[in-house]
Regions:
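N-terminal helix-turn-helix DNA-binding core of bacterial DNA-binding proteins
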Residues: 14-59
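Beta-hairpin "wing" of winged helix-turn-helix
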Residues: 68-84, 89
Length: 127
């Protein structure tokens, strides 16, 4: 049996959400709350998901570049004269995409929540 590539990589619940656009949605969500940078986003996602969705730099930074190229976020170097943290803010198009992705993912999130609650209730109920 092979070992998964990382937390959530082959998890049927988290893996499905990843494919459906959960990471872009989370980045856009946090960017809508205020300026953010890559490491901050990775920490917030890890905290929010209690480690179920671990994001590494090899995933985060290409995603940030792609979202910026699509005009969904705008990046600005903290110190333009030298390479430092790049802070991102959401654009109007990014807000619209966040709303679209949230509406698209809502049924999947509700289904997963219901499944987990059903499993918990079944396993924790008296025999």
């Amino acid at each position: 049996m092979s070992t998964p590539a990382g937390p959530g990589a082959q998890d049927p619940l988290v893996g499905d959400l990843r494919k459906a656009g959960l990471l872009p949605l989370l980045v856009l969500h946090f960017a809508a709350r205020g300026r953010c940078y890559g490491n901050m986003l990775m920490e917030r996602i890890g905290t929010l998901t209690q480690g179920a969705l671990a994001v590494n730099p090899n995933t985060m930074y290409p995603l940030l570049r792609a979202l910026e190229a699509k005009g969904l976020i705008e990046g600005e170097w903290e110190h333009p004269e030298r390479r430092s943290r790049r802070f991102y803010t959401i654009t109007t198009a990014g807000l619209a995409e966040r709303d679209r992705l949230a509406a698209e993912l809502a049924p999947r999130l509700e289904r997963i929540q219901h499944s987990i609650e059903s499993i918990r209730d079944e396993l924790l109920s008296p025999v």
